[in-house]
């Protein structure tokens, strides 16, 4: 339905002002079919406002937005809210379940709204499929008050996907969940993307979730784009101090370690297969340098291991440069955090 080489979401020069306060400032980006696109930033950076603009719940002051063939600049007659909601589903942190309806009745509601002529048997089949996918079938006749937080959020996902949308807009949907429920929900979102190709825009302050899900990430700061690119590149080689802070990279090590003479503090980024190779120990054995590992981590980015180390590299300048050249040739990304004295 939507060609892979053309954006399913296009945002061009979007601004949003309330009174004299600019909430969004010249935002432009594209999301292609089948991507999971992350939006991160500190509180008040404009993330949720931007997502509501994508759902046409909020109108930008200026700029154009296209989502799944619908455009903010077209007339209301062209942009039927009901037709839009069949293609684009919005999931919020609050879940928004009807407390007086069972799980089944909550999920049935959008189907009856979008497909009034659908047979009862087909409705039940589609709801059961959604419940099976989310491991909720046994809770089919339960009321929301009898569900855990993770189960409620999965019901909200079932409500969103039962009408077969092409885009999911997710606003902080894991922020109130415990770690196990968060992992369960993110596994289901990733499976939706892999098996059904559903494009997702994922707003979150939980960086571990963004690492796991998102192939592209937009970093926002004070209503503007701070940085935009593949999530693993933002992790391995952030260009902005805001991005570095959000990804919890090296702020602690930079502040507490005072390096000596003939020593420099480096951050080493290991992409894909490099993350599991023991090249550091080999480097120490082969060269006239010493390495003190200050901190490090290995993360899975959409099931691919990526890692970083913060090290103190000691030795003569010539030997340090040789060591860095070897690492660079092997594909390691190096950033100098503190220079030699």
Swiss-Prot record:
Chief site of localization: membrane
One Pfam family cited in the UniProt record for this chain: NIL
Record field: catalytic activity: L-methionine(out) + ATP + H2O = L-methionine(in) + ADP + phosphate + H(+); D-methionine(out) + ATP + H2O = D-methionine(in) + ADP + phosphate + H(+)
Keywords, sorted A to Z: Amino-acid transport, ATP-binding, Cell inner membrane, Cell membrane, Membrane, Nucleotide-binding, Translocase, Transport
Domain ABC transporter: 9-247
Cellular compartments annotated: Cell inner membrane
InterPro entries with a match to the protein in the record: AAA+_ATPase (IPR003593), ABC_SmlMolc_Importer (IPR050093), ABC_transporter-like_ATP-bd (IPR003439), ABC_transporter-like_CS (IPR017871), ACT-like_dom_sf (IPR045865), NIL_domain (IPR018449), P-loop_NTPase (IPR027417)
Gene3D superfamilies for this protein: 3.30.70.260, P-loop containing nucleotide triphosphate hydrolases
GO molecular function: ABC-type D-methionine transporter activity; ATP binding; ATP hydrolysis activity
GO cellular component terms attached to this protein's record: plasma membrane
Its EC number(s): 7.4.2.11
Membrane topology: Peripheral membrane protein
Cystine bridges: none
Tree of life domain: Bacteria
The protein's role, per its UniProt record: Part of the ABC transporter complex MetNIQ involved in methionine import. Responsible for energy coupling to the transport system.
PANTHER family noted in UniProt: AMINO ACID ABC TRANSPORTER, ATP-BINDING PROTEIN-RELATED (PTHR42781:SF9), SPERMIDINE/PUTRESCINE IMPORT ATP-BINDING PROTEIN POTA (PTHR42781)
Family: Belongs to the ABC transporter superfamily. Methionine importer (TC 3.A.1.24) family.
Quaternary organization: The complex is composed of two ATP-binding proteins (MetN), two transmembrane proteins (MetI) and a solute-binding protein (MetQ).
Protein name: Methionine import ATP-binding protein MetN
